[in-house]
């Protein structure tokens, strides 16, 4: 042990380049899909971080529509986080199998509240909560000129000539019915006229608009949620599972600690089929420990993030490329996967992270400036920025992430992150397009037809500081910013 203190050398993204190889594939033809687990498949290997200035329901919805995944942060109450997950799951479905409904005795106010809360344009009306026989529908058109919201729904709902379809109606069949009758919602009923589902024109349009969406077996967008290692973790997990979360992320600064291992084991024993991501770690030993405890996917990265100060405050970490490779080497032995979390500044770093052994990457700073992030927008020197902070910053720990850094009992915090601002970028769709485009280009240079080929066959070359300087634009003054290249 003593003799091996300085035996290893660590490499990060700026230390290496991928070597170009003979290619028979065009960038537009590469396959970017990846199976993180048997039941968790992404169409692009990009995940938004579970940070309180990066991912809430709006970001998670946008990421899933692009083919990726969003992780709802845990700096909120259990009920709020479960509600965020529910918003994602209800935002888009092929067939809504458990639609909201009201009864004729409810007030118009109840319909207005439900429609406003979930941003829906109508609600089926059933005779009562027990029988659930369809008797009408109320839409925003019915509410348009109503001033007395205490009226009963029975007085304003549409109940004549209701257009319905039987259970098992396909989306193509539903689209024809909706177009024929010029309506937006099609209730599905059984032979006793009981409400069994709902198909909306908006969901059909979204299927067409976002063909690459990441969805579960029921046609709903997929979403993950972060949890910690506090006393209420199992209660939080229970509520998230009830909200149909697709994956739980046990999110801590040091995943190779007994409390984290115990939590992983407890969740696995309670929910044998639940997808579990656990981290963060940076060594093969930690990866093995989490997998043996029950993790399906291991999250790799201690200190590489742009807003993280762990490496300088604590003096601990492993440069990210080396950490990814070491952890992936161990995960392969168990048939498990890893996520590279942190340190990615350009799209080329995504290609490097996946070639080093990652199955997907988790992004924070690259997405924090987009419209969908929950960070506040501010104006600085005439330009728009969004607030971005590490979960180890004082503000984030005060809000609820102190357990991530094992400081839940502290009255004063020792922060391992900072607060900052990042330029506003507009819709996340544009950012993801550029990032994925860079990945496609990199795979084309490497001759990799899919992500598995990139992991297995791509080769690295180490470069000097001079090589890094040569890699960036040099000897010119940039006069027009590129959408995929900015030096802060």
UniProtKB/Swiss-Prot annotation:
The cofactors required by this protein are: K(+)
Q: What is its EC number?
A: 1.1.1.205
The Gene Ontology biological process terms listed for this entry are: GMP biosynthetic process; GTP biosynthetic process
Q: In what way is its activity controlled?
A: Mycophenolic acid (MPA) is a non-competitive inhibitor that prevents formation of the closed enzyme conformation by binding to the same site as the amobile flap. In contrast, mizoribine monophosphate (MZP) is a competitive inhibitor that induces the closed conformation. MPA is a potent inhibitor of mammalian IMPDHs but a poor inhibitor of the bacterial enzymes. MZP is a more potent inhibitor of bacterial IMPDH.
Q: Where does IMP bind?
A: 306, 341-343, 364-365, 388-392, 416
Question: Which residues are recorded as binding K(+)?
Answer: 303, 305, 308, 470-472
Q: Which InterPro entries match?
A: Aldolase_TIM, CBS_dom, CBS_dom_sf, IMP_DH, IMP_DH/GMP_Rdtase_CS, IMP_DH_GMPRt
Annotated CBS domain residues = 95-153, 157-214
Gene3D superfamilies in the record = Aldolase class I
Report the induction information.
Answer: By superoxide.
What pathway is it annotated to?
A: Purine metabolism; XMP biosynthesis via de novo pathway; XMP from IMP: step 1/1
Q: Which positions form S-S bridges? A: none
Q: Please name the catalytic residues of this protein.
A: 308 (thioimidate intermediate), 404 (proton acceptor)
Keyword set for this entry?
CBS domain, GMP biosynthesis, Metal-binding, NAD, Oxidoreductase, Potassium, Purine biosynthesis, Repeat
Q: Which Pfam families match?
A: CBS, IMPDH
Using the UniProt record, name the top-level EC class of this enzyme in a single word: oxidoreductase
Superkingdom in the source lineage:
Bacteria
Q: Which reaction does it catalyse?
A: IMP + NAD(+) + H2O = XMP + NADH + H(+)
What job does this protein perform? Answer: Catalyzes the conversion of inosine 5'-phosphate (IMP) to xanthosine 5'-phosphate (XMP), the first committed and rate-limiting step in the de novo synthesis of guanine nucleotides, and therefore plays an important role in the regulation of cell growth.
Q: Relate the assembly described in the record.
A: Homotetramer.
* Entry's family note: Belongs to the IMPDH/GMPR family.
- Return the protein name: Inosine-5'-monophosphate dehydrogenase
Q: Which organism is it from?
A: Bacillus subtilis (strain 168)
Q: What is the lineage of its organism?
A: Bacteria, Bacillati, Bacillota, Bacilli, Bacillales
The encoding gene is: guaB
């Amino acid at each position: 042990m003593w003799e091996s203190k300085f035996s290893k050398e660590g490499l990060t993204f700026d230390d290496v380049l991928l070597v170009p190889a003979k290619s028979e594939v065009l960038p537009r033809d590469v396959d970017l899909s990846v199976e993180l687990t048997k039941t968790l498949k992404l169409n692009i290997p990009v995940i938004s971080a579970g940070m309180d200035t990066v991912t809430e329901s709006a970001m998670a919805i946008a990421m899933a529509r692009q083919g990726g995944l969003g992780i709802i942060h845990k700096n909120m109450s259990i009920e709020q986080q479960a509600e965020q997950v529910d918003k994602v799951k209800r935002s888009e479905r092929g067939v809504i199998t458990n639609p909201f409904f009201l009864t004729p005795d409810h007030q118009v106010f109840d319909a207005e509240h439900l429609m406003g809360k979930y941003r829906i344009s109508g609600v089926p009306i059933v005779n009562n909560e027990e029988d659930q026989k369809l008797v009408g529908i109320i839409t925003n058109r019915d509410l348009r000129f109503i001033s007395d919201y205490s009226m009963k729904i029975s007085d304003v709902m549409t109940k004549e000539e209701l257009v319905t379809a039987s259970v098992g109606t396909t989306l193509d069949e539903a689209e024809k019915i909706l177009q024929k009758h010029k309506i937006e919602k099609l209730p599905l009923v059984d032979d006793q006229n009981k409400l069994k589902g709902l198909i909306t024109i908006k969901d059909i349009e979204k299927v067409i608009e976002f063909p690459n969406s990441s969805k579960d077996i029921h046609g709903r967008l997929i979403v993950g949620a972060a949890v910690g290692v506090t006393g209420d973790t199992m209660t939080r997990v229970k509520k998230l599972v009830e909200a149909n979360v697709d994956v739980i992320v046990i999110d801590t600064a040091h995943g190779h600690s007994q409390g984290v291992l115990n939590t992983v084991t407890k969740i696995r024993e309670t929910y044998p089929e639940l997808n579990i991501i656990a981290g963060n770690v940076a060594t093969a030993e930690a990866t093995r420990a989490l997998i043996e405890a029950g993790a399906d996917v291991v999250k790799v990265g201690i200190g590489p993030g742009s807003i993280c100060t762990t490496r300088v405050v604590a003096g601990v970490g492993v440069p990210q490329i080396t950490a990814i490779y070491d952890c992936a080497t161990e995960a392969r032995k168990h048939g498990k996967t890893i996520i590279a979390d942190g340190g990615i500044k350009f799209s080329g770093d995504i290609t490097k992270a996946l070639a080093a052994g990652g199955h997907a990457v988790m992004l924070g700073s690259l997405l924090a400036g987009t419209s969908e992030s929950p960070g506040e927008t501010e104006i600085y020197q005439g330009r728009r920025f969004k607030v971005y902070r590490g979960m180890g910053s004082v503000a984030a720990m005060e809000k609820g992430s102190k357990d991530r850094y094992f400081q839940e009992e502290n009255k004063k915090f020792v922060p391992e992150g900072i607060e900052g601002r990042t330029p506003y970028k507009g819709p996340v769709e544009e950012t993801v397009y550029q990032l994925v485009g860079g990945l496609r280009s990199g795979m084309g240079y490497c001759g990799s037809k899919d992500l598995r080929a990139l992991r297995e066959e791509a080769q690295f070359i180490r470069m000097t500081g001079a090589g890094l300087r040569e890699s960036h634009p040099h000897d010119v003054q940039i006069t027009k910013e590129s959408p995929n290249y900015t030096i802060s």
